Amino acid sequence: LGTEAVEAHLELADPSLDSAVAQLAAQGVTRAALVPLLFTNAFHNKIDVPEAVREAQDRHGVQLLVGPHLGTGVDVARVLINTLPHSLPAGAHLILYTVGSSDAAANVAAENLAWELSLLSGHTVDVAYATSGPGVGFGGAAVIEAACGYEDVHILPLFVTDGLLLDRVIDQVDHIAVATGARITYSTPLKTALAPLVAARYRAALSELLTAAHA
């Protein structure tokens, strides 16, 4: 993109958005684009991000142009498919492992992404939720339920990076294999594979700014 990029976090990690914006303000920056690294339009995207943006703008005088979140569209599905190992058997079952939400629409978006993954990859796909969502179990229990009846299972994490929720399942892979009788493999979090999508959301934020300027 040819521009400086900094990271910021809503919670559980540093720097916070407020700290990152304070640093930008100290450097003389008056305007910055912000891309929420969120897949679904649930509480974090609807409430937490706008609130953090308002507070940082008011405190430091830096205008934040908020672009679209990552979403669960075809571009995300293609990034996920690109993480599949070439050695994956043709009949392997995929489990899209995602955080889950109390927002039903967010979980529907994850289910729709699983459907898109199945269309694009030719594999069967189920969704397993880490914390909340439809189903009787979460985390490792949800993965076991989704893996039963298949010989080869590959876990696709819908995660930007490593973290406790994902570690809890990856650390249980051997147990899941014993419980289901399946051969279990897994992809790593998406990390830098998301860079083209982040760039596209950044451009969308700039486009919105230019449109507003000429309105």
Please provide the spans of the model-predicted regions:
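Active-site-proximal alpha-helix that buttresses catalytic centers in soluble enzyme cores
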Residues: 1-215
